[in-house]
Structure formats: C-alpha cells, structure tokens
C-alpha cells in the first residue's frame, strides 16, 4: 500500500482468484465491503463492490499521512485454474472497463 500511496496510483488490476484448486493462490489484500483495515500507517476501506460478469470492480478508500484518495480495484474472475480462457471476449470487456478510467498515474497489476 505504501507504493500505491507514494505514486498516487488510482487503478489496481488483479488477474487471479484467491484460491486455485482448493489452494490459496493470492492473499486478500483489501477489507470486505464496508470494513476498514490498517496496514502500518495506511488505512483502507472498501466502499463499493460491483460484480460485472467476469470481473469485480471495487472502490477502495485509502488514507495515509492525512491524505485520502480513491482507488479503482478490478479483479478478473474468469481466468481458468490452468491454461488460458477459451474465449477472449471476457478479457476484452475487462480491459475496456479498466481503460475507461482515465489516469496519468501508474496502474498496479
């Protein structure tokens, strides 16, 4: 989270699920909807979560050193456990949703 706040990133893209074949694949690094979490001096809250077909879009509120900013968090949920998606249409829709957010800041993937 320090990297996100230092570079004032406004978009995070996640291309994996949390679990694959029953094994943890990725740590959940954001709190549940409406909840707050603290990571050192950084406070984080999930203020919105929308399931859109093959992805989830979240709005995160992050506060560090008295400064608050919002982060668009996109999680692609249709990547198969092994291999690549059979069709590319879901991935194209996901990409389009991400690129609709206009930013000059780094996108965290």
UniProtKB/Swiss-Prot annotation:
Please tell me the species this chain comes from: Styela plicata (Wrinkled sea squirt)
GO terms (molecular function) for this protein are: protein tyrosine phosphatase activity
Matching entries from InterPro entries are given as:
Prot-tyrosine_phosphatase-like (IPR029021), Protein-Tyr_Phosphatase (IPR050348), PTP_cat (IPR000242)
- Give the EC number: 3.1.3.48
Task: Indicate whether ATP-binding appears among the record's keywords.
Answer: no
Q: Which reaction does it catalyse?
A: O-phospho-L-tyrosyl-[protein] + H2O = L-tyrosyl-[protein] + phosphate
Signal peptide start and end residues: none
The entry's protein name is: Tyrosine-protein phosphatase 16
Please provide the record's keywords in A-Z order.
Hydrolase, Protein phosphatase
Q: Where does substrate bind?
A: 81
Q: Which Pfam families match?
A: Y_phosphatase (PF00102)
């Amino acid at each position: 989270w320090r990297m996100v706040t230092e570079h004032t990133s406004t978009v995070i893209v996640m291309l994996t699920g949390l679990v694959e074949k029953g094994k943890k694949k990725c740590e959940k690094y954001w709190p549940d909807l409406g909840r707050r979490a603290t990571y050192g001096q950084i406070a984080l809250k999930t203020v919105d979560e929308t399931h859109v077909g093959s992805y989830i879009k979240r709005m995160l509120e992050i506060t560090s050193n008295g400064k608050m900013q919002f982060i668009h968090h996109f999680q692609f949920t249709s990547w198969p456990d092994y291999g690549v998606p059979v069709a590319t249409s879901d991935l194209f829709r996901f990409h389009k949703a991400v690129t609709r957010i206009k930013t000059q800041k780094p996108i965290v993937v």
